[in-house]
């Protein structure tokens, strides 16, 4: 029987789709690096009566009446975010990481200003200046990337480009970079050319909160993040900044980019921040990193090539060219074995972004199920059976491994 009792009565089609999605999440191994499974407490907050409340403005300065209780919720989220990351100011209203990034741009830049960000094709993000994104249309972005041989950011090259282009803002952070980011070096480069520094830590925020990745907060005027991914909160965004930028950042989000905040999601963010301050969260993040290292080793031992040779965080990029597979083909084949990944461009990829030569793999969601290093080696074996062999017998063996792991590590048990 479905848990969506009222929904089944009102809209059985949507309820049925939700039932199928829940079944997929329970019976598949989720390896998309940007996805995770929130706690039931976070889901309760996200599905609460707060979805009914309009609250344009900020706590104590609303354009609607009846905001005394949602003010309490937003203040909790703000104070917890500041405490969790040691920040001077936090804006928890962005609906997404993309909105958080645009909020920073509109707070500190004018249209046409020069910004230095990471090349999307080398692991950056659409909102770091891709020409198809609004960021690339409003501002003059120039790109840095990774070294062709090491797969790592060449900071000397970043400095050279910064000296040549004199950006007003440098953006550090990535959506597909498996190595530690040197925020001190980015700060030094920014200072040398008179630029501000923004760090998009969307992927690594949970690791930063747990002290397992250097924090960008002491180095950057602005830090943006999503609240899902490794942070294991609801889908949403957040901006941390120095106090001197607080008013401009807040004004850029509301009324600049958004109207009413999503108070039910802000409540869920507050819950996630509270969870992230517990000792169990640090242990969880340590397991994410240990699982990523174990999965990287398991794949390497089975003949897979990883961009940069491995990982320092929660994700890895697999270069499939030695397997004579495209990322698109690998994603489809793994999905048939109930392993969920996403096709992803590798640096200097000869394939189009719709095909790609690689896949991106991450461990946050599998770790949320309780999987450990031994389980990651079994996952590596299932991936190997599916992609290196691909015969019907091998695919059946891979599915059997997935079934056993999902039974051993149930979701929302």
From Swiss-Prot:
Organism of origin is Heliobacterium modesticaldum (strain ATCC 51547 / Ice1)
Protein name per the record: Serine hydroxymethyltransferase
Q: What's the source species' lineage?
A: Bacteria, Bacillati, Bacillota, Clostridia, Eubacteriales
Kindly list the places in or outside the cell where this protein is found, as annotated in its UniProt entry.
Cytoplasm
- Give a GO molecular function annotation for the protein: pyridoxal phosphate binding
Q: Does the keyword RNA-binding apply?
A: no
> Tell me, which GO biological process terms does this entry list?
glycine biosynthetic process from serine; tetrahydrofolate interconversion
| The gene coding this protein | glyA
The subunit structure is: Homodimer.
Site residues, Plays an important role in substrate specificity: 228
């Amino acid at each position: 029987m479905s848990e969506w009792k009222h929904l089944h009565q009102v809209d059985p089609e949507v309820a049925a789709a939700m039932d199928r999605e829940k079944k997929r999440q329970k019976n598949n191994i989720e390896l998309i690096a940007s996805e995770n499974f929130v706690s039931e407490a976070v889901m309760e907050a996200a599905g609460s009566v707060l979805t009914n409340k309009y609250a344009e403005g900020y706590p104590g300065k609303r354009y609607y009446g009846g905001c005394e209780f949602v003010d309490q919720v937003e203040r909790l989220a703000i104070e917890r975010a500041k405490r969790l990351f040691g920040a001077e100011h936090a804006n928890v209203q962005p609906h997404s990481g993309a909105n958080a990034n645009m909020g920073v741009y509109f707070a500190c830049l004018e249209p046409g200003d020069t910004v230095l960000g990471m090349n999307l094709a080398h692991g950056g993000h659409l909102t770091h200046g891709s020409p198809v994104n609004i960021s690339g249309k409003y501002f003059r972005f120039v790109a840095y990337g990774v070294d062709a041989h090491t797969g790592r950011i060449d900071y000397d090259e970043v400095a050279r480009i910064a000296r040549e282009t004199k950006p007003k803002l440098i953006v550090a952070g990535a959506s597909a970079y498996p190595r530690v980011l040197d925020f001190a070096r980015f700060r030094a480069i920014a200072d040398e050319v008179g630029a501000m520094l923004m760090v998009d830590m969307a992927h690594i925020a949970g690791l930063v909160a747990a002290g397992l990745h250097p924090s960008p907060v002491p180095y950057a005027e602005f830090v943006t993040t999503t609240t899902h991914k490794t942070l294991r909160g609801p889908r949403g965004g957040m901006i941390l900044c120095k106090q001197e930028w607080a008013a401009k950042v807040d004004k850029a989000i509301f009324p600049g980019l958004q109207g009413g905040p999503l108070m039910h999601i802000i409540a869920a963010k507050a819950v996630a921040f509270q969870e992230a301050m517990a000792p169990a969260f640090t242990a969880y993040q340590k397991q994410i990193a240990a699982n990523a290292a174990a999965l990287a080793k398991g794949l390497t031992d089975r003949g897979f090539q990883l961009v940069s040779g491995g990982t320092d965080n929660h994700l890895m990029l697999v270069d499939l060219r030695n397997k004579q597979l495209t990322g698109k083909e690998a994603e489809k084949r793994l999905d048939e074995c109930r392993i969920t990944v996403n096709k992803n461009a590798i640096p200097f990829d000869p394939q189009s972004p719709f095909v790609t030569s690689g896949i991106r793999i991450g461990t946050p969601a599998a770790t949320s199920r309780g999987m450990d290093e031994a389980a990651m080696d079994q996952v590596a074996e299932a991936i190997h059976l599916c992609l290196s062999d691909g015969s019907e017998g091998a695919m059946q063996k891979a599915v059997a491994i997935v079934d056993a792991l999902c039974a051993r590590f149930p979701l929302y048990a």
